[in-house]
From Swiss-Prot:
One of its GO terms (cellular component) is chloroplast. InterPro entries: Domain_X, Maturase_MatK, Maturase_MatK_N. One of its GO terms (molecular function) is RNA binding. It comes from Trillium catesbaei. This is Maturase K. One of its GO terms (biological process) is tRNA processing. Belongs to the intron maturase 2 family. MatK subfamily. It holds the Pfam family MatK_N. HAMAP family: MatK (MF_01390). It comes from the Eukaryota. It is found in: Plastid, Chloroplast. Keywords: Chloroplast, mRNA processing, Plastid, RNA-binding, tRNA processing. Usually encoded in the trnK tRNA gene intron. Probably assists in splicing its own and other chloroplast group II introns. The gene is matK.
Length: 521
C-alpha cells in the first residue's frame, strides 16, 4: 500500500516530483516503508531498535503522526533536536520521544533520498532491453574474473577506501544526485545538530562519523555510496580507459556495491589542484575490484610500479576530497605469500609444482613446471567470530541458545536457522574446501536445538529423543542439493569429490549477511 502511495506521488508530474522531494518528509507512509525495510533487511530477522532501548517502538503509528505534527509547527523540530541532544548529554531518562524523532527522521529521510537513485533503475519504454543482463550483476561473477586474471599477476594493493571526516563533504557530493534544495537544507540541519551534540560530548571528528554510521545506518550508507560513486567517477581511468559491470540494486536503492575493471592503458591524469598534468605510466595488466569499502588493485608490474600507485591514491583522495588518507589503509603484498579476505572468502594464489614426462627419440626426461592457481576457502575462524557477535555461539565456538527467538513457534525457529545454513552453503559454493563449513553447520544446528530446548524448558537430549534425531537433518544438506534458479531442482551431482567442486552462481546479488557482518564489524 505504501509503495502504491509513493508511486502515485511520483507519477503526478515525474519531472517536477523527482526534483522536489521535501513534501514527502511529512507523509506517514514514508516512515512505514522505513520501518518495513528495517524488519526485512537481514537474515538474522533482528528488528531495528531505538538506540538505548530494549524493544522495538518504530511500529507505533501514533508516535509517527505526532512527529509529523511537530514538524509542521514552526521551529518545533529544532527544539526537539536540541532536547534530544541535551537529554543524551546529561543521561536523561525521559528522552524517548526526542530519541525516536531523531532516528525516525533519519530513516524517513533516507527513504526519500533513495528515490532519485531508484528511478534510475526503472527503464523507459524507449530503451532497448538486453535479455539476461541480470546475470552480469551477480557477486559470484567476480570470482571467475579473479581466477582468470590474478593467477598471472605479481602484486596486489589491499585498499580500505577512506571516507571524509566532515559530513558536509558528503552533502556536497550528494548535490550531484539530488536537485531538491529544501531537502539538502534539511539534511544539513540534521547533520549540523548531530555535529553540535558531538562537540558537547567531546567526540573527535574522527570518531564522529563512526558514531553517525552506527546510529543512522541507512542514511550513512546513502551518503557513503554517493561518495564512492563520485570517487570512482573522478578516478579517470575507471571512467574513460576501462570497462566495468553496472552496479547492482539492493531493494529500491541503487547501491554501487561492486564492479571490476581491466585497465587497458593509462597515459595521463589531469589534476586541477596540481595545476599541471601528471604523466603516468602504461600498465596493461592492472585490475581493480571493489565491494563496498574494500578494494583490490592488482598488477603484473614491479614493486616500484605498485608503490607509485599507492602514492597516487593517497594524493588523489587528499586533493580531490580534502582529507588525508592514512597510508596504512593501503597494503602492498606479493601474491606468492599473501592471502586476502574479500567478499566472504580467503583468497590466495597457490603455486602447484608438477612434473611432465617427455620423450625425444629414445631418451626420456622429466620437466618440472610450476603453475599458479587462484584458490578460495571458507574463513572458518572469522565466521565463528561473526556467529559469536550474532549470539549463536561463544567466541570459542561453543553453541548457545538464541533467547530472542525462543518465543517463536518451533517451525519458525527451525526455518530461521535452516535459512542461514542454506544461505551459507549457497554463498560458499565456490570454496575449494567445503568440509570447513561442517563446523559452522554444527554450531547452528546445536544452537537451534538449544533454542528449542530453552523454549520447552527441557534439555537438548530429551528434545531430540522426543522429536527425533532427524529433526535438524536439513542443516547438513549438501550444497549440490541447494535449490538455485540457475540449476533445475532435479540436477544431481556426484557426491564423491563434491567437496572439491567449485560452483559460482549467477543469482547472488548481495553478500552473505554473516560475511557482510564481519566486513563492517
Amino acid at each position: 500500500m505504501e509503495e502504491l502511495q509513493l508511486q502515485g506521488y511520483l507519477e503526478k508530474d515525474g519531472s517536477r516530483q523527482q526534483n522536489f522531494l521535501y513534501p514527502l518528509i511529512f507523509q506517514e507512509y514514508i516512515y512505514t516503508l522505513a520501518h518495513d525495510h528495517g524488519l526485512n533487511s537481514s537474515i538474522f530477522y533482528e528488528p531495528m531498535e531505538i538506540v538505548g532501548l530494549g524493544y522495538d517502538n518504530k511500529s507505533s503509528s501514533v508516535l509517527v503522526k505526532r512527529l509529523i505534527t511537530r514538524m509542521y509547527q514552526q521551529n518545533s523540530l529544532i527544539y526537539s533536536m536540541n532536547d534530544f541532544n541535551q537529554n543524551r548529554f546529561v543521561g536523561h531518562n525521559n528522552s524517548f520521544y526526542s530519541n525516536f524523532d531523531s532516528q525516525m527522521v533519519s530513516e524517513g529521510f533516507a527513504v526519500i533520498v533513495e528515490i532519485p537513485f531508484s528511478l534510475r533503475l526503472v527503464p523507459s519504454s524507449e530503451e532497448i532491453q538486453i535479455p539476461k543482463s541480470q546475470n552480469l550483476r551477480s557477486i559470484h561473477s567476480i570470482f571467475p574474473f579473479l581466477e582468470d586474471k590474478l593467477s598471472h599477476l605479481n602484486y596486489v594493493l589491499d585498499i580500505l577506501i577512506p571516507y571524509p571526516i566532515h559530513l558536509e563533504i558528503l552533502v556536497q557530493i550528494l548535490q550531484c544526485w539530488i536537485q531538491d534544495v529544501p531537502s539538502l537544507h534539511f539534511l544539513r540541519f540534521f547533520l549540523h545538530e548531530f555535529h553540535n551534540w558531538n562537540n558537547l560530548n567531546l567526540i573527535t571528528p574522527t570518531k564522529s562519523i563512526s558514531v553517525f554510521s552506527k546510529e543512522n545506518k541507512r542514511l550513512f550508507w546513502i551518503l557513503y555510496n554517493s561518495y564512492v560513486s563520485e570517487y570512482e567517477f573522478l578516478f579517470v581511468f575507471l571512467r574513460k580507459q576501462s570497462y566495468y559491470l553496472r552496479s547492482t540494486s539492493s531493494r529500491a536503492f541503487l547501491e554501487r556495491t561492486h564492479f571490476y575493471v581491466k585497465i587497458e592503458h593509462l597515459i595521463d591524469v589531469c589534476h586541477n589542484h596540481f595545476q599541471k598534468i601528471l604523466w603516468f605510466f602504461k600498465d596493461s595488466f592492472m585490475h581493480y575490484v571493489r565491494y563496498k569499502g574494500k578494494a583490490i588493485l592488482a598488477s603484473r608490474g614491479t614493486y616500484l610500479l605498485i608503490k607509485k600507485w599507492k602514492c597516487y591514491l593517497v594524493n588523489f583522495w587528499q586533493y580531490n576530497f580534502h582529507f588525508w588518507s592514512k597510508p596504512y589503509r593501503i597494503h602492498i603484498n606479493p601474491f606468492s605469500n599473501y592471502s586476502f579476505y574479500f567478499l566472504g572468502y580467503i583468497s590466495s594464489v597457490l603455486i602447484n609444482p608438477s612434473a611432465v614426462k617427455n620423450q625425444m627419440l629414445e631418451n626420456f626426461y622429466l620437466v618440472d613446471t610450476l603453475t599458479q592457481k587462484f584458490d578460495t576457502i571458507v574463513p572458518v575462524i572469522p565466521l565463528i567470530g561473526s556467529l559469536s557477535k550474532a549470539k549463536f555461539c561463544t567466541i570459542l565456538g561453543h553453541p548457545i541458545s538464541k533467547p530472542i527467538w525462543a518465543e517463536l513457534s518451533d517451525s519458525d525457529i527451525m526455518d530461521r536457522f535452516g535459512r542461514i545454513c542454506r544461505n551459507l552453503s549457497h554463498y560458499h559454493s565456490g570454496s575449494s574446501k567445503k568440509q570447513s563449513l561442517y563446523r559452522i553447520k554444527y554450531i547452528l544446528r546445536l544452537s537451534c536445538a538449544r533454542t528449542l530446548a530453552r523454549k520447552h524448558k527441557s534439555t537438548v537430549r530429551n528434545l531430540l529423543q522426543r522429536l527425533g534425531s532427524g529433526l535438524l537433518e536439513e542443516f547438513f544438506t549438501e550444497e549440490e542439493q541447494v535449490i538455485s534458479p540457475i540449476f533445475p531442482k532435479t540436477t544431481l551431482f556426484p557426491l564423491h569429490g563434491s567437496h572439491r567442486e567449485r560452483i559460482w552462481y549467477l543469482d547472488i546479488i548481495r553478500i552473505n549477511d554473516l560475511a557482510n557482518y564481519l566486513d563492517w564489524s
